[in-house]
Amino acid sequence: MNVIVIGGGASGLMAAITAAKGGHSVTLLERQARVGRKLLSTGNGRCNLTNLNMGLPYYHGQDASFIRPAFEALSLDATLDFFHGLGLLTTAEDNGRVYPYSDQAGSVVDVLRFAADAAGVTTRAGFEVTGLKKTKQGFTVLSAEETLPADRVIVCCGGMAGGKLGGTRSGYELLQSLGHSVTKLYPALVQIKTDNTFVKALKGVRANADLRLCRNRDAVAASRGEVQFTDFGVSGPAVFELSRAAATEKGPLTLHIDLLPQLSTPEIEELLRRRLSSMPELTTENLLAGVLHNRLGRTVLRYAGYGLTDPVASLSPADLRKIAGAAKDFALPVVSVLGFDGAQVTAGGIRTAEFDPKTLQSRLVPGLYAAGEVLDIDGDCGGYNLQWAWSSGYLAGLLKSGT
């Protein structure tokens, strides 16, 4: 069959390679000047291609269980075997995140390009699809310059995340033109903008912390890990984990940060009491030196309502309790999440109920398939979205007809 894959990202490359290996004539269309451009930016340029801790709880959407058949078709182990078979060496970190041993995202893109070429895929970069029509013979793919016929079409256009790297609404619009519907779309795995009264002075400071995103003190989401403070709010892996909830939850939200999760409030009080007893000549500016980053320690003191020039000997047990409490609950009112340009993934997408999970073929338009971020599935930070791309691209590329 003559197969056209629209979108040369992770899922599109996998779908094209799989379909070509199945004996089909495959053309891969990519709007950008080269395939895999967004892949080059993943994992801070290292490409976190999957995670050893894989499972349904790491995925979201109106029906997250939709992923199961794809993950049965191409499991975590099978994914690693696939990449190892292409000659890519990988390494796993303690948190389960898997990276190319080279620490270069370009290595992943290269082996996929080589595999596509070896399988006989015709890749056309710089080809912007403007329309998709169903015909009696199959499909017609439209651009400003030409039309291409296809027996089968796999839409792998990605989502709106990373607009500067090519994220657009094009995939949604193509599928909507054929009768499909899209959920509300939100940026996810993105920085959170907060009240910056205290964070502005912390730009660039990192901390390992426990985070709770709360509405009226009730947690709607929680995470643990690295937080990076910015001039507008917070970033980092632990923040990305909360960003989906921050984008979708209604009502005023507050981010509560425990800056010393390994210590209880009484333990922090005792630590400060010992410092006060042994070094009464210190000023409050240095009370938390060696406990927190210097700028963070000073900010916690200001947050708790204390100046930086008072002698620590003037602090009462109640003062120490208040300062310890501030370190355990550094609360920042949430303003918003940053937009799609800074997001790593789109939450929401084409409704999965309109596709057969066992084949990823459209229930509305026979011969039409979709995979990856364009569908209403998104994963947590840590390689989960790329695993969905690999598995869904593989299943779609099998071009199963279903029952």
What is each PLM-predicted segment?
Residues 1-11:
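Beta1/beta-strand and adjacent pyrophosphate-binding region of the FAD-binding site
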Residues 4, 20-44:
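Glycine-rich FAD pyrophosphate-binding loop
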Residues 4-6, 29, 129, 148-164, ...:
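Short hydrophobic core segments
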Residues 33-35, 40-41, 49-56, 89, ...:
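An anion/pyrophosphate-binding glycine-rich loop and adjacent beta-alpha core
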Residues 46-92:
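Glycine-rich active-site loop/strand segments that organize a redox cofactor
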Residues 125, 298-378:
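A glycine-rich dinucleotide-binding beta-alpha-beta segment and adjacent secondary-structure elements
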Residues 125-138:
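A conserved short coil-to-beta-strand element within the FAD-binding core of flavoproteins
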Residues 152-198:
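Glycine-rich loop(s) and the adjacent beta-strand/alpha-helix scaffold that form part
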